[in-house]
């Protein structure tokens, strides 16, 4: 696959911020953390799939960092959109990040499962990026069934919002997170991922990147 520019969405910005926060709080644990995928299916056009294990035993901290990252990213959206997305996900923007959210309560109801994710068939759904660009979809195992649930819920909402590359290219280069933050302040559009041209089933097992 030829080298292409990444098509930025709030999905990417959120997950990058969240992973950075997790890395800053990394504590050696005995948590078993692995992702087993028997089959990846979906509709893809110029998409890349990344599988990441990032484990920690403190589920409460995982959720706190998750909410912090979420609030940072959506704070640059119009207030109406911020509140709509937060309500859909189950996060009260009036609460402090460390508060137990509705999202966390709902996800913890499913936490009595093995922290090894065993997905026999993973349906990515639809993913499409413009010619010459690619969209990165990340699957992250935090080592907690509850936190994984929260992560998936947030990503499903944020993956619908993207940052136009033309705006990003006009800005001077700084730290990547600062650059993207300024780009979002300038303009953010909400779009539905569409114009899918092909359906396929992909076999994936224990890799790092999968390009389609």
From Swiss-Prot:
Matches recorded under Pfam families: L1R_F9L
Entry keyword Transmembrane: yes
Ranges per topology, Virion surface: 1-175
GO cellular component: membrane; viral envelope; virion membrane
Membrane topology of this protein: Single-pass membrane protein
Residues on Intravirion side: 197-212
InterPro entries: Virion_mem_poxvirus_L1
Subcellular location: Virion membrane
Superkingdom of the source species: Viruses
Keywords, comma-separated and alphabetical: Disulfide bond, Late protein, Membrane, Transmembrane, Transmembrane helix, Viral envelope protein, Virion
Residue ranges of the TM segments: 176-196
Post-translational modification: Disulfid bonds are oxidized in the cytoplasm by OPG088 protein. Unglycosylated because produced in viral factories instead of the classic ER -Golgi route.
Disulfide pattern: 33-55, 47-127, 107-149
Protein task: Component of the entry fusion complex (EFC), which consists of 11 proteins. During cell infection, this complex mediates entry of the virion core into the host cytoplasm by a two-step mechanism consisting of lipid mixing of the viral and cellular membranes and subsequent pore formation.
Subunit structure comment from the entry: Component of the entry fusion complex (EFC) composed of OPG053, OPG076, OPG086, OPG094, OPG095, OPG099, OPG107, OPG143, OPG104, OPG147 and OPG155. Except for OPG095 and OPG052, each of the EFC proteins is required for assembly or stability of the complex.
Entry similarity comment: Belongs to the orthopoxvirus OPG053 family.
Name of protein: EFC-associated protein OPG053
């Amino acid at each position: 696959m030829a080298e292409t520019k990444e098509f930025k969405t709030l999905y990417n910005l959120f997950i990058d911020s969240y992973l950075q926060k997790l890395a800053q709080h990394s504590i050696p644990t005995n948590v078993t953390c692995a992702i087993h995928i028997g089959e990846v299916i979906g509709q893809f056009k110029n998409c890349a799939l990344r599988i990441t294990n990032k484990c920690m035993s403190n589920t409460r901290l995982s959720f706190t960092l998750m909410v912090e990252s979420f609030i940072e990213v959506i704070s640059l959206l119009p207030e109406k959109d911020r509140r709509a997305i937060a309500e859909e996900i189950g996060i009260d923007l009036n609460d402090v990040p460390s508060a137990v959210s509705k999202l966390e309560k709902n996800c913890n109801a499913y936490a009595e499962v093995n922290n090894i994710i065993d997905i026999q068939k993973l349906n990515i759904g639809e993913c499409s990026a413009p010619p010459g660009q690619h969209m990165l979809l990340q699957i992250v195992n935090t080592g907690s069934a509850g936190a994984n649930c929260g992560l998936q819920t947030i990503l499903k909402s944020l993956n619908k919002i993207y940052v136009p590359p033309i705006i990003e290219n006009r800005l001077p280069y700084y730290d990547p997170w600062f650059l993207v933050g300024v780009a979002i302040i300038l303009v953010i559009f909400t779009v539905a991922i569409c114009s899918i041209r092909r359906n396929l089933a992909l076999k994936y097992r224990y890799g790092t990147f999968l390009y389609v």
